Amino acid sequence: MYGFRLLALFCIANLASPAYARVDTVYTGHQQLAKNVDQEYNYRVIETALKLTEPEFGDYKIIVQGDGDIPKQRALEQLLKINGAFNVVLVPTQPEWEEKAIPIPIPVRMGLLNYRFLLTHKDKLATFGTIHTLETLLPLRVGLRKSWATWEVMQQQGFNVVNAYSYDTLFSMLDMNRFDYIPRGIYEIYDELKSRRLDYPNLVIEPNLVLVLPTPYYAFVSPHAPRIAERLTAGLTMMMEQGILRNMLYQHYGEALEQANIGARRVIHIKNTTLSEETPLDKKHYWIDLFNASLTP
């Protein structure tokens, strides 16, 4: 009996020790992995939010799953499964994601994806010189992937949408004049063009237009991981309120923002009627206004 009591006390003591404390594990995909600037930002956001909440929630670890990027629909399927491959994914918000997963309505890129430049064929530049309004832009053919958040928005707004079945084929289709332009985030378009310069020397960035399309970029959490959702919400809130997120944004994308010279462009606003009522548009400090912001934090 005495030996049993000693064993019981030993077990209780060890279970209460830090070695046995709960560890929150985030499972995410390679689209969040630090293999380029854009994906490094996603990874750092997750890691910083977890680090900031250690005093309240304890230890954590991040496990990256899979061998490469995964289509968004498959990522959502895994997010919804019990013990699926992912329990956290960062993507532009879409109604299906908000309905089925747990959205954390804090725009982790502070609306940077709201601003879109147009990748086009050099032979089309004269056409864009005549575009000054949404009405004159609508008839032109826009190339999109159906999985993108912009697809549903632009369809609803009456754009002439042409579907591309993969990310890479978008550029070859544009080169063959299958459509007139691809709208890309201002932090995406320069690297995309640079990496394809040899393959598609006729592709250029249209120099005079910027589309403004509200596109919040959220962290989505599995409905089977409510504690992770609570922890990330707390961490992201601290990052936003303390200016950490804004500083991180400029560290990663400041060079692209300077190169964009967005203030010299004609602006075309596009409504996003797919946004939910929970979108924090009233929290002005959650969003970066590139028309009225300095290029330093």
Describe each PLM feature range:
Residues 16-18:
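N-terminal signal peptide c-region/cleavage motif recognized by signal peptidases
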Residues 21-99, 232:
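Extracytoplasmic small-molecule ligand-binding "clamshell" domains
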Residues 32, 112-117, 121-124, 198-230, ...:
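Periplasmic-binding protein-like
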Residues 35-51, 118-158, 170, 187:
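Bilobed "Venus flytrap"/periplasmic-binding protein-like clamshell domains
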Residues 65-86, 156, 168-188:
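Short helices/loops that flank or line small-molecule/ion binding pockets
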Residues 67-137:
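Acidic, polar ligand-binding/catalytic clefts
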Residues 80, 87-100, 182-202:
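A ligand-binding cleft/hinge motif common to bilobed small-molecule-binding domains
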Residues 145, 149-156, 236-296:
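Ligand-binding clefts/hinges and TM-proximal coupling segments of bilobed small-molecule sensing domains
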